[in-house]
From Swiss-Prot:
The record marks G29, V30 as: Cleavage. Belongs to the mycofactocin precursor peptide family. Mycofactocin is classified as a ribosomally synthesized and post-translationally modified peptide (RiPP). Precursor peptide that leads to mycofactocin (MFT) after extensive post-translational modifications by enzymes encoded by adjacent genes. Mycofactocin acts as a redox cofactor of nicotinamide-dependent oxidoreductases encoded in the same locus. Is required for the in vivo ethanol assimilation in M.smegmatis. This is Mycofactocin precursor peptide.
Length: 31
């Protein structure tokens, strides 16, 4: 695995986590 791919994978993971948190906040009406 090249370092560049590792960084992309980590970025994807962070993005997914942020999207999940935003979705949960949106459903709860918390902004």
């Amino acid at each position: 695995m090249e370092p560049n791919q590792h960084v992309e994978a980590e970025t994807e993971l962070v993005t997914e986590t942020l999207v999940e948190e935003v979705s949960i906040d949106g459903m709860c009406g918390v902004y």
